[in-house]
Regions:
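Short amphipathic alpha-helical segments enriched in leucine
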Residues: 20, 59-63, 97
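Sec-dependent signal peptide hydrophobic core
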Residues: 19-27
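Residues marking the start of alpha-helices
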Residues: 6, 43, 105-108
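Mature-region segments of soluble proteins
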Residues: 53-57, 71-174
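N-terminal secretory signal peptides
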Residues: 1-10
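Post-signal-peptide N-terminal segment of Sec-exported extracytoplasmic proteins
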Residues: 65-71
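C-terminal segment of N-terminal export signals and the immediately downstream linker at the start
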Residues: 9-14, 27-63
Length: 174
């Protein structure tokens, strides 16, 4: 009698886990971007999922904040997933990938080292694509109230009586 462990093939556990994973890939659909840690996900309608993932990485490289999750960068990039913006964004991502390939990196998203990605961005920082993404990030990222605590910003003060009434008149720090 042969012991089950000595048989070639896969175990029941492997079969079940692979079946579930394969089934999930059909349910999720094509226009889907998910975090590597599984903490968030978003669907794209006009951009390719890989292009959106590249834009998110680009956003993180332009304004790097280790204390912020990719989810907030994804929210900031969501506006570029429109019929009007998608062609320019796809062309910009193609230019990023071409620059990375020219350096022997594969694609921008596959470039492992941040300093290499930043060098790629520096090479195109005068482009309309780069300026559009960078400019949109200023409001798209920093206008999210959920990220304010990470920077110690308490938000606007007018609706709370102004800054003076909230302890900002203490000049002991001078």
């Amino acid at each position: 009698m042969t012991h089950a462990a000595s048989r070639p093939g896969i175990t029941r556990r492997q079969l079940l886990s692979r079946s579930v994973a394969a089934g999930a890939s059909f349910i999720v659909g094509a226009g889907f971007v998910a975090a590597t840690d599984g903490a968030w996900a978003m669907e794209t309608t006009h951009l390719k999922p890989r292009s959106m993932a590249t834009l998110i990485q680009m956003a993180r490289d332009i304004y790097p904040h280790d204390q912020l999750a990719d989810e907030y960068y994804a929210i900031a990039m969501r506006g570029y997933d429109s019929a009007e913006a998608a062609p320019a964004m796809e062309a910009g991502v193609a230019a990023l990938d071409a620059a990375a390939e020219g350096r022997g990196e594969g694609s921008y998203l596959d470039t492992l080292w941040e300093r290499d990605r930043v060098d790629i961005l520096r090479g195109m920082e005068r482009s309309v694509f780069f300026q559009t993404v960078r400019g949109g990030l200023v409001t798209g990222l920093y206008n999210q109230p959920e990220v304010w605590p990470a920077f110690g910003y308490e938000g606007e003060s007018f609706s709370k009586g102004g800054y003076i009434a909230r302890g900002f008149d203490d000049i002991a720090w001078l």
